[in-house]
């Protein structure tokens, strides 16, 4: 307002004033002068003054422009100076951030909207705006700082936590001595259980994880020297990935050693047999006694057969009788043995067959308790099958004859 009034006073005393309207500038349509009222010609002289540029006129608010364009409204009947408008918005020439186009002023994107009462107060709204912006920035900065502080413990990357990583420290000497003593006492099995780890954790005032890590490192670094001082091989008392092949070979050797003992255990009942031919496993089993008296009667053994496991060759332990038995017993035995899938059909040993119970070979309960001198070896099973088959073939030959 002050700038506009100074411009008006400068235009009145200007020697370049002319009473004709519409002169000076062709940017705005200038109103015509009033010849009946020569005192009002200063308005047109002000508008036609060359001191007013287009930019200055462009910065004039619409309310001031309307008051200048209508002298009757500006001066009244007595052409008195116009009263300063109380609610007139601030001229645009005082705000450098605004454009040069005429029209209503638009607020900046970071500027709060002005009320009409704030127009004449000067830069006070801007100060409040700056204070408000500082508060917003401070609040956002505090929030980001809080978020950053919350993210710091969760960041496990080496680049982010390198500056705040703690320096590596050693365990207390008392705790290390307790762990060393336990390791030396259990050097042949240096693998503490969960209860022992908890006890050591209480004694050393360390966490269970620290105790576990210490033993992992001690078994790799300290334990081999302890075992070598005792003259022991460390690979036999530690479980490591490097010694996995050695442990596998030792386990294979132990398994092979167990297998080597199995034939000896199987051969022991063969030598304790009191009757039967030569127990040589590599030869075909075809016992042929030289005389009828050489066949000794073995104790009675009940017939039990595992049909599901051995379907083709059912083994049975049966009673062997002498040659001088009656023929009616032989015919009863011939009726019982009808299986033709038995092996060793070429054996023609003259031996009496064995008698069986009612249901034959299928897990029948024993009619009498077995004797103490039973022989369940595999060799005797084969001998019994051969003798049984030979007796069956002999009976068939007699019946056909």
Swiss-Prot record:
Instruction: Write the record's keywords in alphabetical order, separated by commas.
Output: DNA-binding, Homeobox, Nucleus, Repressor, Transcription, Transcription regulation
GO terms, biological process = negative regulation of transcription by RNA polymerase II
A Pfam match is Homeobox_KN
Q: What molecular function terms (GO) are annotated for this protein?
A: DNA binding; DNA-binding transcription repressor activity, RNA polymerase II-specific
Cited SMART domains: HOX
Q: Which InterPro entries match?
A: HD (IPR001356), Homeodomain-like_sf (IPR009057), KN_HD (IPR008422), TALE_homeobox (IPR050224)
Ranges spanned by the short sequence motif CTBP-binding motif, renumbered to the chain: 153-157
Q: Which PROSITE patterns match?
A: HOMEOBOX_2 (PS50071)
Residues in the DNA-binding region are 164-226
Q: Please list where the region (Disordered) is annotated.
A: 1-20, 78-127, 139-170
Query: Which cysteines are cross-linked by disulfides?
Result: none
Source domain of life: Eukaryota
Predominant location category: nucleus
Cellular location of this protein?
Nucleus
Mind telling me which GO cellular component terms the entry cites? nucleus
The function of this protein is: Binds to a retinoid X receptor (RXR) responsive element from the cellular retinol-binding protein II promoter (CRBPII-RXRE). Inhibits the 9-cis-retinoic acid-dependent RXR alpha transcription activation of the retinoic acid responsive element. Active transcriptional corepressor of SMAD2. Links the nodal signaling pathway to the bifurcation of the forebrain and the establishment of ventral midline structures. May participate in the transmission of nuclear signals during development and in the adult, as illustrated by the down-modulation of the RXR alpha activities.
Q: Record's family?
A: Belongs to the TALE/TGIF homeobox family.
Name of the protein this chain belongs to: Homeobox protein TGIF1
């Amino acid at each position: 307002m002050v700038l506009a009034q100074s411009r008006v006073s400068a235009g009145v005393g200007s020697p370049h004033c002319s009473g004709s309207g519409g002169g000076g500038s062709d940017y705005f349509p200038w109103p015509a002068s009033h010849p009946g009222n020569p005192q009002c010609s200063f308005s047109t002289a002000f508008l036609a003054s060359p001191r007013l540029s287009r930019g200055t006129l462009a910065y004039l608010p619409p309310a001031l422009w309307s008051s200048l364009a209508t002298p009757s409204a500006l001066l009244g009947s007595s052409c008195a100076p116009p009263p300063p408008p109380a609610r007139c918005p601030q001229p645009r020439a005082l705000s450098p951030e605004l454009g040069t186009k005429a029209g209503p002023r638009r607020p900046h994107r970071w500027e709060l909207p002005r009320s009409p009462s704030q127009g004449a107060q000067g830069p006070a709204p801007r100060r409040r705006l700056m204070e408000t912006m500082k508060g917003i920035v401070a609040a956002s900065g505090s929030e980001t700082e809080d978020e950053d502080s919350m993210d710091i413990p969760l960041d496990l990357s080496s680049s982010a936590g390198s500056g705040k990583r703690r320096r590596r420290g050693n365990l207390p000497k008392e705790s290390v001595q307790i762990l060393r003593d336990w390791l030396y006492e259990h050097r042949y099995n240096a693998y503490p259980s969960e209860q022992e780890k908890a006890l050591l954790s209480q004694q050393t005032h360390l966490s269970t994880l620290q105790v576990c890590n210490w033993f992992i490192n001690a078994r790799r670094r300290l334990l081999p020297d302890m075992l070598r001082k005792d003259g022991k091989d460390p690979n036999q008392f530690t479980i490591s990935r490097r010694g996995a092949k050695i442990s596998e070979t030792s386990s294979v050797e132990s398994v092979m050693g167990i297998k080597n003992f199995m034939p000896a255990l199987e051969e022991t009942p063969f030598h304790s047999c009191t009757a039967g031919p030569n127990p040589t496993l590599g030869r075909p089993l075809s016992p042929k006694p030289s005389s009828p008296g050489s066949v000794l009667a073995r104790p009675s053994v009940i017939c039990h057969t595992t049909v599901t496991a051995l379907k083709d060759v059912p083994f049975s332990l049966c009673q062997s009788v002498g040659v001088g038995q009656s023929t009616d017993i032989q015919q009863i035995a011939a009726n019982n043995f009808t299986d033709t899938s038995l092996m060793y059909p070429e054996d023609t040993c003259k031996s009496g067959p064995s008698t069986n119970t009612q249901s034959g070979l299928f897990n029948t309960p024993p009619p009498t308790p077995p004797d103490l001198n039973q022989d369940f070896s595999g060799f005797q099973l084969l001998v019994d099958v051969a003798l049984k088959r030979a007796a069956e073939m002999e009976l068939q030959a007699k019946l056909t004859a």
